[in-house]
Every structure is written in structure tokens, then in C-alpha cells.
A protein has these predicted regions:
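Conserved short alpha-helical segments that host acidic/polar catalytic motifs at enzyme active sites
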Residues: 1-284
């Protein structure tokens, strides 16, 4: 029902992405470990999508990480040729406890496939959704994440790259969003211009990058914290070059403000956010 959509109180979700440049990691297992470390950010549903040589497939369901990802399910996602993965844990109101709202959301379109994970809350989601529905869009769930997916996909069909499509989409999004997006050849982290929800970058010992809501997930995946994604920044790990690059068209807003509850309540004490230990911040 629309009422669920109008008040999607999934403030506290966890997102994760991994690109293993060396090809030595079991990326599905790394995603599982990371989501287990982020379980405190959402207990309603979870999911993992893997990129196996450009082919994206995934599994998502209602339940805790260790319930949804049995050894058999995790095994079906673990292949030696999969070098990228994304994962998500979701927290939401009871009314929208449906599998259609579980993430990562996988979208197949004329230019390829995209898997998207979202932590945050759009303030203009209802307005955007109605606008899209009036133009013929069909939605399967009640989450604002689906609106983001639709907008990026529509822009991608008109534009030269997924990152330009994301930047164009950011022009109309209002509110909080930290995104991890996986295409056939790229893993991308996006943070809203106000930086309301945390998002950090880590490096893998064998080469490659990890994106996560909190640094505790980097630790779980065997990565080292590099830095936070800046408010408004789009960070691209490109498998064709193996390097990180950044688009800062939406950076530089003077009113950046991270949610105070990240330090007080949401985040794990052993995480480091914006250079500060959550544990130390709570003691203060």
C-alpha cells in the first residue's frame, strides 16, 4: 500500500560492495562476512548479488544473514570467476515486510544489468514515484530504492556511462542516500550531498576495493580502511583499469550533516566514522 511507501522508515540499513582485482577472494563469502558484521543495521531482510564475469545474479529474502544464506545458498553464489559482489541488510517498518523490498535490487535493461543497494530515506520519493507512474513506470515493491533504480536505468539508456546516469539522477534526488551499485564492469559508491549516512572505502591486500556503511564490515572482509566517501561524491572502481576514480560534481555543499544517531545508536562501537572511533565518541 502507498501508506507504507510514504513513510519508509528504513533509516538504518547496511550496504556493502567488493571488487577483488587479484581474483583470489571468494567475494560471496566476503559479502556474507561483511553483512554479518553489519547485521545490527538491519534484521528484516538481506541479500547478496555477485558479478560472475559480467553476469550478475543474486539471492535475497526476509530473515537474518545466517538464516537466508545457508551453506547451500552461499555455495551457489561462490564461483572462482566472480570478482565483484554487493550486499545489503535492511531494517523497515512492519507494513513493508515483503520480499520485493529486499535488496540488492537487480535491474536488467537495454544497456546491461545493475545491482543496487541503498541506505537512507528520500524525502521526495512519493513525488518522484507518482511522476514516473504517470509516465508508465511499473513498480513491484513500496520502497524508495526502486525509484532510484528506475531513474538511474532511464538515464543510463540515454547516456554514455552508468556514472553519468547516476550523476544526472542525483540532480533530482532529495534526502539521504548511500548507494553501492554494481554493473558488469564497475563497482560504484555514492553518497548524498549532505552526507547524512556513512559510507567508507577500504583496500584489499591483493589489490581491489571494498565499500561499506561502516568500517567494521571492511575488517570482516579483510580490507583496510582507506577513507570515507565524501558527501556528494561518486567513487568508481573500474575493472578495466583496476583503479579508483571519483566524480565530485555534487560535492561542496556547505550544509553537510551526518545523522547524529550514527554515533549514538546505529553504528557498531568498533567502527570508525569520519575519522572518529564510535566507541570514543560515545564515551564523550
Amino acid at each position: 500500500p502507498m501508506s507504507d511507501f510514504a513513510y519508509p522508515l528504513h533509516e538504518e540499513c547496511g550496504v556493502f560492495g567488493i571488487y577483488d582485482r587479484a581474483g583470489t577472494e571468494d567475494v560471496a563469502a566476503a559479502a556474507y562476512s561483511a553483512l554479518y558484521a553489519l547485521q545490527h543495521r538491519g534484521q528484516e531482510s538481506c541479500g547478496i548479488a555477485v558479478n560472475d564475469d559480467g553476469v550478475i545474479q543474486g539471492h535475497r529474502d526476509l530473515g537474518l544473514v545466517n538464516e537466508v544464506f545457508t551453506p547451500a545458498v552461499l555455495g551457489s553464489l561462490s564461483t572462482p570467476t566472480a570478482h565483484m559482489a554487493t550486499g545489503h541488510v535492511r531494517y523497515a517498518t512492519a507494513g513493508s515486510r515483503v520480499r520485493a523490498n529486499a535488496q540488492p535490487m537487480i535491474v536488467r535493461h537495454g544497456r546491461g544489468t545493475m545491482a543496487l543497494c541503498h541506505n537512507g530515506n528520500l524525502t521526495n520519493a512519493l513525488e518522484l514515484r507518482r511522476q514516473l507512474e504517470n509516465e508508465g513506470a511499473i513498480f513491484h515493491g513500496s520502497s524508495d530504492t526502486e525509484v532510484i533504480c528506475y531513474l538511474i536505468t532511464r538515464n543510463r539508456l540515454r547516456m554514455g556511462s552508468i556514472e553519468t546516469a547516476i550523476s544526472k539522477t542525483m540532480d533530482v534526488l532529495e534526502g539521504a542516500y548511500s548507494l553501492v551499485i554494481m554493473s558488469a564492469t564497475k563497482l560504484i559508491a555514492v553518497r548524498d550531498p549532505r552526507g547524512y549516512r556513512p559510507l567508507c572505502i577500504g583496500t584489499l591486500p591483493g589489490g581491489g576495493y571494498v565499500f561499506a556503511s561502516e568500517s567494521c564490515a571492511l575488517d570482516a572482509a579483510g580490507a583496510t580502511l582507506l577513507r570515507d566517501v565524501e558527501p556528494g561524491e561518486i567513487v568508481i572502481a573500474d575493472t578495466k583499469t583496476g583503479e579508483l576514480r571519483s566524480i565530485k560534481d555534487h560535492c561542496g555543499r556547505p550544509d553537510t550533516q551526518m545523522c547524529v544517531f550514527e554515533f549514538i545508536y546505529f553504528s557498531r562501537p568498533d567502527s570508525i566514522i569520519e575519522g572518529s572511533s564510535v566507541h570514543e565518541a560515545r564515551k564523550q
